[in-house]
């Protein structure tokens, strides 16, 4: 995937009403491409968005869409999209964000790569533009808590931890267990939600201040070297974040 700040975006429509909704959205997203059945190409007349009007089956378009785009917004039924994309799935680190919008433009559902791929964030943006309701199911987004795997990504932070640590610590966070958040480096503007930080997240300025026996996990933002014995002592309870060395963030 390319830079999530400037994603390659495609709107896909296969029905009359879906094309109408896609055209409405495309007017607000001039950088988005459009992929539609040739039958409904005229719906997009007057728009400046690049348009691909195909004559065959939508299933033949999915592979190229997955290769070319970072976010794909389908104005297609959820079940159909699941069946169409299934043969093309690789991993959450490689797959594009996939979003589904119903033909009436009432609901926007992130289906694939909601967190790491940015589909959750884009679903909220699409919903806002359409006047629709975003339907998010990612636990940290629904619970308005820390997204362990992508925390600080907008600031250039790099996550340093085995995947099992990220999985275990994410579970502790979304289950509302006590979490120590230690920030020794990086920008203080890492919390971007409109809601307050959950009261289960306790902040510390130094790792040595943390009474480790009181916390299910530790999130540590630092430039310091983490000795192997510390990883071993905390087992799967530690995730480290590395802010850029040459910037305040």
What are these model-derived regions, one by one?
Residues 60:
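Nucleic-acid-processing active sites and adjacent nucleic-acid-binding tracks
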Residues 5-10:
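Extreme N-terminal starter segment of soluble prokaryotic enzymes
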Residues 12-42, 46, 52-57, 65, ...:
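Conserved mixed alpha/beta catalytic, RNA-binding, or beta-rich assembly cores of soluble enzyme
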């Amino acid at each position: 995937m390319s830079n999530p700040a400037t994603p390659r975006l495609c709107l896909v429509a296969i029905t009359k009403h879906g094309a109408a909704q896609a055209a409405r959205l495309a007017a607000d997203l001039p950088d988005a491409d459009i992929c539609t059945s040739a039958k409904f190409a005229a719906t997009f007349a007057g728009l400046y968005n690049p348009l691909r009007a195909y004559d065959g089956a939508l299933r033949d378009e999915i592979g190229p869409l997955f290769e070319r785009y970072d976010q794909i917004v389908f104005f297609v039924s959820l079940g159909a999209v699941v069946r169409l994309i299934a043969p093309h799935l690789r991993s959450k680190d490689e797959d594009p964000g996939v979003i589904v919008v119903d033909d009436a433009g009432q609901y926007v559902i992130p289906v694939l790569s909601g967190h790491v791929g940015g589909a959750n964030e884009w679903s909220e943006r699409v919903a806002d533009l359409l006047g629709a309701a975003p339907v998010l199911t990612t636990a940290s987004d629904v619970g308005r808590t820390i997204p362990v795997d992508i925390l600080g990504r907008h600031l250039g932070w790099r996550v340093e931890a085995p995947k099992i640590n990220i999985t275990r610590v994410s579970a502790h966070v979304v289950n509302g267990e006590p979490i120590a958040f230690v920030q020794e480096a990086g920008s203080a503007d890492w919390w971007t939600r409109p809601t307050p930080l959950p009261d289960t997240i306790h902040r510390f300025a130094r790792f040595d201040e943390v009474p480790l026996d009181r916390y299910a996990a530790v999130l540590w933002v630092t430039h310091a070297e983490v000795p192997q014995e510390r990883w071993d002592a905390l087992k799967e309870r530690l995730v480290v974040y590395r802010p850029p060395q040459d910037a305040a963030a």
